[in-house]
């Protein structure tokens, strides 16, 4: 099992030429994706889901959750299990985390991934990650996993493959961005397949 952290070759990763109008581009993209998901869900489309930040307290029905406190999910494959991971668990996943398209990366820079090239369930690598906790960055420092990742993974079951859209607010904390090498204000797009749940074996 291996997780690949793809490091930038230079400081160009934060160059405005690489990521022009990055804040506005990312905010507009997530807003459009959220709107699309809401429209699809209202029409009965089961391929789209929206989840509020798991760290928010219990809310009454009159509370309006801010757009940037939600993650959007597009279901690529549904598993048949019923158990969901808890915040204290760890999980075995195959995944890729990428940014929106930029000047050099037309498909978005994949800055964390367990496989190279196209998705292949038979050959993909995998890694054990905490549901809530930290990981080692490509600069060998510990960084907290995004709340958006933790929010989505707790809603999955084994066999699910989801594309998860995480707004910058629920992405990596400002203190972690430099360690990972991604620019601020980045929407993160995860392709996650949940392979196994390890109850109460959280990796911190």
Spans of features found by a protein language model:
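Sec-dependent bacterial lipoprotein signal peptides
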Residues: 1-10
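Cross-family detector of peptidyl-prolyl cis-trans isomerase
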Residues: 9-204
């Amino acid at each position: 099992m291996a997780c690949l952290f793809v490091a930038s070759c230079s400081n160009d990763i934060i160059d405005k030429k690489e990521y022009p109008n990055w804040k506005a581009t990312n905010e507009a993209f997530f807003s459009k994706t959220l709107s699309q998901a809401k429209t699809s869900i209202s029409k009965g489309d089961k391929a789209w889901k929206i989840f509020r930040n798991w760290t928010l307290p219990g809310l009454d029905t009159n509370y309006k959750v801010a757009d940037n406190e939600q993650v959007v999910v597009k279901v690529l494959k549904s598993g048949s299990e019923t158990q969901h991971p808890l915040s204290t668990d760890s999980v075995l996943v195959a995944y890729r985390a990428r940014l929106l398209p930029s000047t050099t990366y037309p498909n978005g820079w994949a800055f964390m991934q367990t496989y190279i090239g196209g998705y292949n369930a038979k050959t993909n690598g995998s890694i054990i990650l905490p549901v809530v906790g930290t990981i080692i960055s490509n600069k060998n420092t510990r960084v907290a996993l995004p709340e958006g990742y933790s929010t989505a993974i707790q809603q999955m079951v084994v066999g699910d493959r989801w594309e998860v859209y995480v707004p910058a607010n629920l992405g990596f904390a400002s203190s972690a961005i430099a360690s990972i090498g991604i620019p601020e204000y980045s929407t993160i797009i995860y392709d996650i397949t949940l392979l196994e749940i390890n109850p109460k074996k959280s990796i911190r």
